[in-house]
């Protein structure tokens, strides 16, 4: 089991769609997506732009956070892009 620090990221496609994902290396994952070796949802979508990323803790926390962000409306995701909060865990996972 690895203690790697995970990150949550949002990519914007050429058509304006926002894609949410998690990784231990944002630059590597973005390069994979841009090379067509990432998620099928992004293949053939044109240029991809990293518009948001933040630390998400361990893998378990990152997966929970990814799920919560994927449940947000496009408008709420756009607010994340504008506000650029450093930590989302306090917004979404603290009860």
From Swiss-Prot:
Q: Which InterPro entries match?
A: GIY-YIG_endonuc, GIY-YIG_endonuc_sf, UPF0213_domain, UPF0213_GIY-YIG_endonuc
Task: Tell me the domain of life.
Answer: Bacteria
Domain GIY-YIG positions: 4-79
Signal peptide, first to last residue: none
Recorded hits in CDD domains, A to Z, give: GIY-YIG_UPF0213
Q: Name one Pfam family in it.
A: GIY-YIG
HAMAP family membership = UPF0213 (MF_01029)
Q: Which family does it belong to?
A: Belongs to the UPF0213 family.
Name recorded for this polypeptide: UPF0213 protein YPO3475/y0709/YP_0608
């Amino acid at each position: 089991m690895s203690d790697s620090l995970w990150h949550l990221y949002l990519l914007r496609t050429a058509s304006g769609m926002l894609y949410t994902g998690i990784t231990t290396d944002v630059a590597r994952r973005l390069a994979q997506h841009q090379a067509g070796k990432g998620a099928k949802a992004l293949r053939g979508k044109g240029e991809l732009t990293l518009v948001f990323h933040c630390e998400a803790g361990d893998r378990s926390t990152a997966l929970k956070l990814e799920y919560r962000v994927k449940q947000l409306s496009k408008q709420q995701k756009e607010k994340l892009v504008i506000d650029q909060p450093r930590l989302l865990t306090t917004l979404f996972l603290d009860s």
